[in-house]
Structures are given as C-alpha cells and as structure tokens.
C-alpha cells in the first residue's frame, strides 16, 4: 500500500511539474504545430448516412470499429485575433459516432489559453477533412482526421476574442472546454487515411454566435452535397493544442511514443 501511495504521489508531482513547465514557457506550441482555428455551424438538415469505419489513435492504439451515422455540424476556419490560417482550402465535417466508447484517461492539454489537466471521458464524434464550394471531383484534402472525446477540467479563458471567417465577424468568450480531438487513422471503404500531423490536437470550447443562413456545397470522404448552415447556441470554437497523456513515465518522451504509433 505504501509503495502504491508513493508511486501515485510521484505521478501527481510529475504531472504538476509538466503543467508548471508549460505555463512558464508561455504555453508555446511545438515547431510542427498547425495554428488554424475553426468554429462550427449547425447543419439544419442533418444527414443520416450510417457508415462503419475503423479508427486508431493514442487512446485506442490497436484500433476499434465504430459507426458514424449523421453529419450534424460543419467546421469553417477562422482568424482568432488575426491568427494565421495556412490552408484556407481545408474545412471539416462533424460526424456523430454511435459508439460512445469510454476512455477515462487523464491528459495535460496546452494551448494559448493555458495548460490544465483534463479528464477524457468518452468518444463522441469524428472530424473528416472537407472542401467547401469546390467542384465535386471526389478529391478531399490530405489532412488529419480527428476522434473527439468529451473532456472536462480546462476552464474558460478570462477574455473574449475577435473571430472572423469569410462569411462574418464576431466577438466570442469561450466557455469551459467540452471536447478534446486527437489525430487518428481512419479506414473506410477499403482506403486507409493515416494522420499527417500527430502533434496538433484540438481543444473544443462552447461559444454562442448567431448567424444568417448559408448554403455551401460541401464534399468529404462520405458524401458531396449542399448543406443548410446556421449558427445558434451552442456552437464550438476549436483551438489548436498539444496533449500529454497521464500517467506517464517522465523519463521518456510522450511525443516520441505518439509519433512511433504511426510509423
């Protein structure tokens, strides 16, 4: 019992040390970090299109079969306080995952809002790369898929932010983090889509914008069609972040393990 308590205490101290280290460094991202932010629009006519897929990420290292069943939201890139958007061609579709598989892991999430230990609870949805208002050629961007999990423990930032996409401008104050999205491998229809960036994760915060209606033509790996979009509470702001899973052996590089997963 004493040995277990000592081990648990060491893990706790290591976790706190990592948080303090990130904070002292100003929560600066790594060199391969993608700075793109996104926000969501509701799909006013959710598309029910069940598809079995196989996915693999840092939480499910052996991979698991799941089913996506409906396209419920669309992600548009945004400038947050004039943040960079390296690829304005890339958008994402939000597909609900039927299998709400539990994870129950702890992780340190770091972004420009700070660094906090969060509890990752269960699987919720998939982000698939998509284009907007492009010809229906079947081509989709070579970019990450993401598995997104319900997560708690990262508080709301203290400030509001200017947010702008090609449709509108807004000011939003994000609420407490609600989801964490991790890069994943996806297998579907006989094709394998590996992640292209295992560093950039997405921390997801509720926001409350209200917009007019928009009707873009959207194409992802599942379908191509017009979507009827509108923003109303709650929508979500996706903030690029880094993640370190806990408990971890502080003598080894977690990011090395993550990269090794996809070699």
Q: What is the predicted function of each stretch?
A:
Residues 1-13:
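Bacterial N-terminal signal peptides that target proteins for export
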Residues 25-29:
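Boundary at the C-terminal end of the N-terminal hydrophobic targeting segment
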Residues 51-68, 104-120, 158-175, 213-229:
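Short, tandemly repeated low-complexity microdomains enriched for cysteine and small residues
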Residues 10-22:
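Bacterial N-terminal signal peptides
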Residues 35-50, 89-104, 142-159, 198-214:
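Extracellular/lumenal glycan-associated surfaces
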Residues 78, 125, 129-133, 228-248:
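A recurrent domain-boundary module in secreted/ectodomain proteins
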């Amino acid at each position: 019992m004493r040995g277990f308590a000592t081990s648990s205490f060491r893990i706790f101290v290591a976790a706190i040390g990592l948080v303090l280290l990130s904070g002292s460094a100003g929560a600066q991202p790594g060199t391969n970090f993608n700075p793109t932010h996104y926000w969501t629009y509701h799909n006013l006519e959710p598309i029910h299109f069940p598809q079995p897929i196989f996915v693999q990420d840092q939480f499910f290292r052996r991979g698991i079969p799941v089913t996506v069943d409906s396209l419920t939201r669309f992600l548009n890139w945004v400038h947050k306080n004039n943040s960079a958007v390296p690829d304005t061609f890339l958008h994402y579709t939000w597909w609900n995952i039927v299998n709400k598989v539990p994870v129950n892991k702890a992780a340190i999430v770091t972004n420009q809002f700070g660094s906090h230990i969060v509890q990752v609870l269960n699987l919720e949805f998939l982000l698939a790369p998509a284009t907007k208002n492009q010809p229906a050629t079947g081509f989709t961007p070579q970019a990450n898929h993401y598995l997104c999990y319900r997560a708690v423990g990262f508080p709301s930032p203290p400030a509001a932010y200017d947010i702008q996409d090609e449709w509108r401008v807004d000011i939003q104050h994000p609420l407490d983090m609600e989801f964490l999205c991790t890069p994943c491998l996806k297998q579907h229809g006989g094709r394998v889509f590996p992640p292209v960036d295992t560093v950039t994760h997405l921390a997801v915060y509720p926001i409350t914008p209200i917009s007019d209606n928009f009707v873009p033509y959207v194409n992802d790996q599942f379908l191509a069609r017009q979507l009827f979009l509108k923003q109303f509470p709650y929508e979500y702001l996706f903030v690029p972040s880094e993640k370190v899973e806990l408990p971890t052996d502080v003598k080894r590089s977690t990011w090395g393990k993550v990269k090794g997963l996809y070699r």
